[in-house]
């Protein structure tokens, strides 16, 4: 289930229709507003890295009333995007969602989203992490920014004090993680990378699929690296539907 808000414009209607066509349930219909739907211009360089120029649009109006508490209560995991802390309303939404999750034993996961978000809104992110998130997703740049260090080993130790479970992705090098007891290092998968846009989302989605199906966090990380390696070989953040079935079939 995806909770978000979009305007009743071409981009917003397309987004909601795309969610529906991919069998992702959602609560809020497009809103009639003078504020446009959020948009993001993604520029991809020859090394497959991407730079984003984002207009949050009506997303800055996302409010606690847009949450569906019953959906959160019925979920195994609540997944929050760190981008939400960029607006005061988004921050309140995150806190309310975590409170609802904690009341119903729904586990909380959060993505730090972007090193610029971490640098600009570290206090806000810390507030959310202090609410005892069960699982943190971040890449190496985000981890270093949050820990205020240039040594990933130091950052790793700091994250062990923050959350019982976390995963730090390292691009083509794979990822490192901690599951509350064990540290692990998952090697990357060699691939001809074209576009890294969507790799982090694919990784997080694959991990959450695994652990909510009963697998360990380490196995989830292995699957996450495998799935992410498939999306970076294509232009754009998503694959066609059939490719997702192939990824699951080939891995499991």
Model-identified regions with their sequence ranges:
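Conserved beta-alpha-beta core of the PfkB/ribokinase-like small-molecule kinase fold
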Residues: 77-157, 173-175
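Short beta-strand scaffold segments in enzyme catalytic cores
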Residues: 39-43, 51, 174-178
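A short, aliphatic-rich alpha-helical micro-motif
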Residues: 69-73, 129-130, 160
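Hydrophobic beta-strand scaffold residues
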Residues: 26, 108-109, 166
